[in-house]
Amino acid sequence: MHVTVEDQSTIKKVLHVEIPVEVVSRELNAGFDQIRKTAKIKGFRPGKAPMSMLKRLYKDQVHADVSIQLIQSSLPNAIREKALNIIGDPQINPSVLSEEGPFTYSATIEIKPEIDDIDFKGLTLKKPLYACTDEEVDHQLTLLRKNLAKLQDIAEPRPAQEKDAAIIDYQARLDGQPVADLPDEQEFHLRIGSGAIDKTFDQQVVGMTVGETRTFEVTFPETHGSKTLAGNTISFTVTLKSLKEEILPELNDELAAQFGPFDSLDQLKTEIRKNLQSGYDRRGEQELHEQVFTALLEKTSFEVPETMVQHELDGILDEIDRTYSAYNLSLEALGQTKEALSEKYRDTAVKQAKRHLILNKIIDQEKMAISDDELAEGFESIAKSMGQPADMVKQYYQGNPEQIDVLRYTLLEKKAMRIIIEGSTVEEVTPDPSSPDTAGDQA
């Protein structure tokens, strides 16, 4: 076997493989011999048909099978011979197999980039320390109260307000014609301010009184998910049929007990604060990690294999799809396409692939490994997050070796990041209060 490598880039190679004619002949003969044992040809007993007839009848089938067999048996050896650390599946371009000459094919492959040793020690970093405020705790309490809110008829007649629950009839017209995506509705339940139809629609309903009919126009944004509505001005005729207001439960110990094993409102507040602060702590860690990668990317340069980018992009799109599915939504219903999302998140996928490559380089560079004790700690951490016994989690992973490999690598990446930060100068800073808030989960 003769193998040559054509460089298309630092990470993209084309292997040109030539298999000698004597090997081709041997495999073809073996292929026809195998066919001869089972072929049913009129006038001949199994195994007795002449080779000339077999070649005439089964040439295409045997040549196709032998081509595949030659590629499958030779490609791993060719990759090992050239010491290539490939990523993903090769793209094969075979020649036409012939009995008279060698068999050749090319395999386009991607390889992991060769990254020089990275000097990751002595980075200067700033870790933002976010703190949960009393106002944020109060906001979460309000959200919890809304979960138990009751609707009741307004005590005294008044105009509709934000947050009211209204029942309305409406008609929608575009140039005087009905709108397919907004069919006429009777007894439509509208929470004013929710934007169920459009925020501007809700604003027009505010101020109406029960029994009133109002006609108004709403111009939908060009980016609206409905092609029928996007950029168009729709005329609505709305009749307010009834109005209820939201009554929140009192904020007391009894309320707290409805959200978990809390003996008092103060205990619930403490749990909310802990969860919010946990979210802020994660945000601070994430921003610190971003600084690490920004600093390390300035110290090295390399190409990223498209296979890795596509793998990260597939993960992002799968997560989006799962999120939409949880709310019974779809890309089509929201006016989005997989192609548009792929373009939108491609830079994110490239960045994630670079992160993995950098950490993998440092892991190899420092000869890091995960001990049995560290793996056990990983099981404990997963068990705690899932609310499951550690033994059950351990048993699951022991029955799934591939998942253990994934867990080990995840733990290795965390270990590498921890070592990088420990070797850095980290200044704790108070973040800009005008920056967007990111809070944790509520109780």
UniProtKB/Swiss-Prot annotation:
Principal EC category: isomerase
Entry EC number(s): 5.2.1.8
SS bond partners: none
Pfam family, one: Trigger_N
Catalytic function, reaction form: [protein]-peptidylproline (omega=180) = [protein]-peptidylproline (omega=0)
GO MF: peptidyl-prolyl cis-trans isomerase activity; protein folding chaperone; ribosome binding
KW Cell inner membrane (keyword) present: no
Subcellular location: Cytoplasm
PROSITE patterns, A to Z: FKBP_PPIASE
Keyword Ubl conjugation in record: no
Domain PPIase FKBP-type: 163-249
Keywords: Cell cycle, Cell division, Chaperone, Cytoplasm, Isomerase, Rotamase
GO cellular component term, pick one: cytoplasm
Record InterPro entries: PPIase_dom_sf, PPIase_FKBP_dom, Trig_fac, Trigger_fac_C, Trigger_fac_C_sf, Trigger_fac_ribosome-bd_bac, Trigger_fac_ribosome-bd_sf, Trigger_fact/SurA_dom_sf
GO BP terms in the entry: 'de novo' cotranslational protein folding; cell division; chaperone-mediated protein folding; protein transport; protein unfolding
PANTHER family in UniProt: TRIGGER FACTOR CHAPERONE AND PEPTIDYL-PROLYL CIS/TRANS ISOMERASE, TRIGGER FACTOR-LIKE PROTEIN TIG, CHLOROPLASTIC
Record-stated family: Belongs to the FKBP-type PPIase family. Tig subfamily.
UniProt comment concerning the protein's domains: Consists of 3 domains; the N-terminus binds the ribosome, the middle domain has PPIase activity, while the C-terminus has intrinsic chaperone activity on its own.
HAMAP family linked: Trigger_factor_Tig (MF_00303)
Role: Involved in protein export. Acts as a chaperone by maintaining the newly synthesized protein in an open conformation. Functions as a peptidyl-prolyl cis-trans isomerase.
Name listed for the protein in its UniProt record: Trigger factor
Source species: Desulfosudis oleivorans (strain DSM 6200 / JCM 39069 / Hxd3) (Desulfococcus oleovorans)
